[in-house]
């Protein structure tokens, strides 16, 4: 879902982050989306996005998109998560009337009980995580406001 949009959204909120180039990051091989130089530390950032839709509806996406306060079930599947390739994940979740952001250290994802390793058969180092009505509150400590995206949550995620 809309990774180009999500990357643009994150970059507009935090213009200090940069897209890696071979000049700045000679070993770069498209394994992360952005980097942020924090002191002497280069933080590699991967952006993931998903949307809240009625999990039981067969309607088109624009019809089954849920409002934030909806009581209907949803399942946001953050896919192709490769914790070894970045330091930090920024997740963007889109409801019909709201956008939420979470910042995680990659090691926190690897240890999360909802993270399933091996999204595809034979794929090592890649997994997925489902956010839904039943578990979303457990991720509250990782949620950030847009203005705080590069604040202590990001910096704390890699310390």
Language model region names:
Residues 1-32, 37-43, 48-159:
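Nucleic-acid endonuclease domains
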């Amino acid at each position: 879902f809309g990774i180009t949009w999500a990357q643009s959204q994150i970059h507009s909120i935090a213009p200090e982050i940069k897209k890696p180039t071979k000049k700045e990051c000679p070993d770069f091989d498209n394994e992360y989306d952005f980097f942020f130089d924090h002191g002497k530390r280069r933080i590699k950032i991967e952006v993931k996005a998903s949307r809240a839709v009625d999990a039981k509806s067969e309607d088109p996406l624009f019809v089954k998109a849920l409002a934030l306060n909806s009581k209907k079930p949803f399942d946001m599947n953050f896919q192709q998560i490769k914790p070894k390739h970045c330091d930090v994940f920024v997740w963007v979740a889109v409801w019909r009337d709201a956008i939420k952001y979470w910042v995680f250290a990659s090691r926190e994802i690897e240890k999360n009980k909802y993270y399933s390793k091996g999204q595809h058969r034979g794929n090592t180092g890649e997994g997925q995580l489902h956010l839904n009505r039943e578990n979303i509150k457990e991720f509250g400590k990782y949620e950030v406001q847009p203005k705080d995206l590069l604040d202590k949550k990001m910096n704390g995620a890699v310390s």
